[in-house]
């Protein structure tokens, strides 16, 4: 069974003074409010789509002046910062093997691999000798890659059920990629709200800033924006994303 999943994180810090979309009546499956830590089961429930993720909206980018705004692209704004590039990365074949405390600022990731973001970790892990460092690339255009039945409420059985032994996911039931990097907020962003934008994460992720739990997002290929203003500090900040295949 040849199946593939692509993970790509395209990230940007977007600083703006516009109001939070969370003030509107949220869509079903979106929830808001302070939560100290995830339960670890959010990725198994189709009823829970997001925590503290901004409501879907058109692309919004602030600019410092009209001339910059006429150039349209966000990189022409001093209130936009890209987080694309090398991130510290750890690959685990299943959720139980993941480094559970990696989001804590005191957790040492200096020995981790670097991985370019955005990228597919499966493809990036293909070595020159043909060996696979980060799991098996899976290609499929319609069937789901985990064991299931077409039946009402079958989702309650979860994605970790044992599939046939000839399935690629028999060995790597649900891979987890742990991503971390540092960033700094420009001084002239003081007094503004700061949002982080993920332009596509497949298929689920938790987010922490400076060791504090921000929320989670499903819906792999849609943009996920979070207001991270309350979690920021002056100087170096740490962003951590835990991605489930």
Residue ranges and their predicted role:
Residues 199-204:
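Short proline/glycine-enriched turn/loop motifs at strand-loop junctions of beta-rich domains
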Residues 209-245:
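Beta-strand-rich ligand-recognition modules
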Residues 23-197:
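Extended carbohydrate-recognition surfaces in non-catalytic/accessory domains of CAZymes
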Residues 5-10:
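Sec-dependent signal peptide recognition
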Residues 13-14:
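Short, linear, compositionally biased motifs with a strong N-terminal bias
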Residues 1-3:
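Short, Lys/Arg-enriched N-terminal segments with co-localized hydrophobic residues
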């Amino acid at each position: 069974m040849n199946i593939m999943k692509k993970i790509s994180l395209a990230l940007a810090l977007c600083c703006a003074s516009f109001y939070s979309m969370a003030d509107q009546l949220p869509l079903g499956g979106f929830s808001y409010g302070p939560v100290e830590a995830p339960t670890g089961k959010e990725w198994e429930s189709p009823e829970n789509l997001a925590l503290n993720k901004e409501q879907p909206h058109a692309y919004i980018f602030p600019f410092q002046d009209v001339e910059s705004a006429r150039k349209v692209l966000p990189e022409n704004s001093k209130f936009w910062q890209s987080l694309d590039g090398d991130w510290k990365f750890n690959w685990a074949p299943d959720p139980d093997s993941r480094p559970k405390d990696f989001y804590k600022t005191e957790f040492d990731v200096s020995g981790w691999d670097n991985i370019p973001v955005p990228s597919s970790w499966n493809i990036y892990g293909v070595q020159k000798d043909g060996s696979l460092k980060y799991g098996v690339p899976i290609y499929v255009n319609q069937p789901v890659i985990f064991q299931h039945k077409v039946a009402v409420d079958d989702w309650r059985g979860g994605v970790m059920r044992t599939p046939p032994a000839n399935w690629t996911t028999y060995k790597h039931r649900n891979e987890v990629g742990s991503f971390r990097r540092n960033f700094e907020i420009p001084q002239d962003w003081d007094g503004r709200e700061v949002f982080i934008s993920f332009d596509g994460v497949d298929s689920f992720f938790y987010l922490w800033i400076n060791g504090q739990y921000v929320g989670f997002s499903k819906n792999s290929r849609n943009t996920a924006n979070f207001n991270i203003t309350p979690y920021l500090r002056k100087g170096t900040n740490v962003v951590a994303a835990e991605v489930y295949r």
